[in-house]
Amino acid sequence: MSPQTETKASVGFKAGVKEYKLTYYTPEYQTKDTDILAAFRVTPQPGVPPEEAGAAVAAESSTGTWTTVWTDGLTSLDRYKGRCYRIERVVGEKDQYIAYVAYPLDLFEEGSVTNMFTSIVGNVFGFKALRALRLEDLRIPPAYVKTFQGPPHGIQVERDKLNKYGRPLLGCTIKPKLGLSAKNYGRAVYECLRGGLDFTKDDENVNSQPFMRWRDRFLFCAEALYKAQTETGEIKGHYLNATAGTCEEMIKRAVFARELGVPIVMHDYLTGGFTANTSLAHYCRDNGLLLHTHRAMHAVIDRQKNHGIHFRVLAKALRMSGGDHIHSGTVVGKLEGERDITLGFVDLLRDDFVEQDRSRGIYFTQDWVSLPGVLPVASGGIHVWHMPALTEIFGDDSVLQFGGGTLGHPWGNAPGAVANRLALEACVQARNEGRDLAQEGNEIIREACKWSPELAAACQVWKEIVFNFAAVDVLDK
């Protein structure tokens, strides 16, 4: 090796390990409109300064590795590296910090939620220097949003397809979720739709099991919804779950649903994966199918306050990947969901522009630049007594889904559907007349019971059923 080469090497590269904060902690950095911004809740190991922890997150989720490497000199780290540009201590929590990280847009493949998550939440969550790490929020810049198709159709197109306006939509998950034959399953679908519901639904784990193969279920459900449509004069739908073991099989099931002429299919977007979900969303737009997405497995990822990914991030990812509906919790039912947090990500699903609002857990202003909106689905442990609260909390652009709250009616499935439809109509009418659903809800339901024995029977069964448990994931004080 010549002396000149040795001299250049000694100047251009110095082997060894150096602190992340020397390269990746840049409090002077001014974020760009094209940056993807992330807010991480960081819990460092004892003895690790917060600046080093935040810089480590920025490094390990972008260009960094544990040691200096020769090939750093072959690219521009200043152009491609993530930067931890701000750190806040979490009030009321010991050794917890919010680290803000900016990522250059060139780090991400266009139109790929899969690639975005692989970078931002890939290896870094197993990093030993951190006791815990949670991704609280993302700011997706308009330049990146515009590379996604998003929901196949969106809220307004769905309403136009269904010809239903001015109220929430009503649904029901068929129970028991497993074990019914296809014919008995179709019977339950017919009874619920005939009783007044807009939708019925496959449960998330109904795919193609020995007791009910997918093709048989699709056929009996299509027969049921067409019969109910003929008798009621309303457009009906059943969420036919197309989730399968391979993308090819999933698309095959969606093709069969399209051939049957049904309006909507379903996908478990977290267990199925973002690549599969985006593929199905593209198929649904091209072929006029609505897409209902279920968030099965979400609580494994989002429920713990100090580690994982907050659901508001998963909701944003779903809007980008594509889905016309997404389960969002109920606030009042059996599943986790604090009111302000829930309404925060509901707005992120539906609205075109959402301002930063830390009181609702929204860390960044989000501009969706006309990406279609997603209907939030309130489902899980709800019944007729919850109808006023659900109508007040979620408003018209939502789906209120009663499984046990329909099929558990003492008189059967159809009366259960009648009870829910009448409770909803009573709440919408009362709201339109200027009544306060939050204060007068129970009285509104009692008044409606005078005109509906089905509703009165439902109210009697569920009058004392409540789920009074404190939420695990709550806002910081």
From Swiss-Prot:
Group of enzyme by EC: lyase
Record note on modification: The disulfide bond which can form in the large chain dimeric partners within the hexadecamer appears to be associated with oxidative stress and protein turnover.
Domain of life: Eukaryota
Positions with a binding annotation for substrate: N123, T173, K177, R295, H327, S379
Binding site for Mg(2+): K201, D203, E204
Gene Ontology MF annotations: magnesium ion binding; monooxygenase activity; ribulose-bisphosphate carboxylase activity
Pfam families referenced in this protein's UniProt entry, alphabetically: RuBisCO_large, RuBisCO_large_N
Keyword Protein biosynthesis annotated: no
Residues with the N-acetylproline modification: P3
Catalytic activity: 2 (2R)-3-phosphoglycerate + 2 H(+) = D-ribulose 1,5-bisphosphate + CO2 + H2O; D-ribulose 1,5-bisphosphate + O2 = 2-phosphoglycolate + (2R)-3-phosphoglycerate + 2 H(+)
Annotated Gene Ontology cellular component terms: chloroplast
Keyword Oxidoreductase in record: yes
EC identifiers of the protein: 4.1.1.39
Cofactor: Mg(2+)
Propeptide residues, chain positions: 1-2
Note: The basic functional RuBisCO is composed of a large chain homodimer in a 'head-to-tail' conformation. In form I RuBisCO this homodimer is arranged in a barrel-like tetramer with the small subunits forming a tetrameric 'cap' on each end of the 'barrel'.
Function (record text): RuBisCO catalyzes two reactions: the carboxylation of D-ribulose 1,5-bisphosphate, the primary event in carbon dioxide fixation, as well as the oxidative fragmentation of the pentose substrate in the photorespiration process. Both reactions occur simultaneously and in competition at the same active site.
HAMAP family: RuBisCO_L_type1
PANTHER family: RIBULOSE BISPHOSPHATE CARBOXYLASE, RIBULOSE BISPHOSPHATE CARBOXYLASE LARGE CHAIN
Quaternary state and interactors: Heterohexadecamer of 8 large chains and 8 small chains; disulfide-linked. The disulfide link is formed within the large subunit homodimers.
Annotated protein name in UniProt: Ribulose bisphosphate carboxylase large chain
